[in-house]
Amino acid sequence: MSRIGILCPGAIGHLNPMCNLGIELLRRGHKVILFGVPEVEEKISQSNLEFCEIGGSDFPLGSIETMYAQLGQLTGLEGLKFAIQFFKKEGNMLFRDAPNAIRNAQIDLLLIDQVTSAGGTIADYLNLPFITVCNALPINKEPGVPPYFTHWRYKDVWWAKLRNQLGNVLTNYLTRSIWDVLVQQRKIWHLPPHYKRDDSYSKLAQISQLPQELDFPRQKIAPWFHVDVANYKKPAFHNIKRVDC
């Protein structure tokens, strides 16, 4: 039996598929612990997973839902600035609180949501193997794939590939302050530097709930990238178990 930890955003759209994966691992005899802010506990209360609270001082009960409500009222640059500040705060919290909690829980392997960019660095710091889980659209970048936040159509022509790359450059520029938090933490922990965003994804395995038939044609998919792994039997639900960590 392995002790498997989960790091993922508190949004239900990320928690549901991640819990589905965790439940299947439970069925196979492993212990699964999800590390999250206080209000995540209620959201996964019928998942059978164990829960370890982190980040309560930064994100008290109700703060995540309040954040999403505020974000829903914003548009354009104001919305982007608000989201960036939230993700910077979340990243700093994870770097501060998650390592000790994961150590105390004696975790053997981490499942990390693809958008939890701090997760790979935490795993590297703890010398733990980790798997990247794409609970939303895969955001792996390559010239032929339009940026995930656009409505651009796929076209296998030079100008579309140039457009896609410019879109990715713009995204990296606008979110550079989030990336800087990760880069700085790797320096503090004396870890090898990451030069591009995809460096934070696992080289052991990346798994996606999106079937290949529904994704854009990818030319640079890693051999450790796996798709459509969500065909699980429906388990019997019980109450969540809180653990000390």
Task: Tell what function each PLM region has.
Residues V169-C245:
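A nucleotide-sugar donor-handling region in carbohydrate enzymes
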Residues F35-V37, I54, V133-N135, Q209, ...:
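Generic beta-sheet signal
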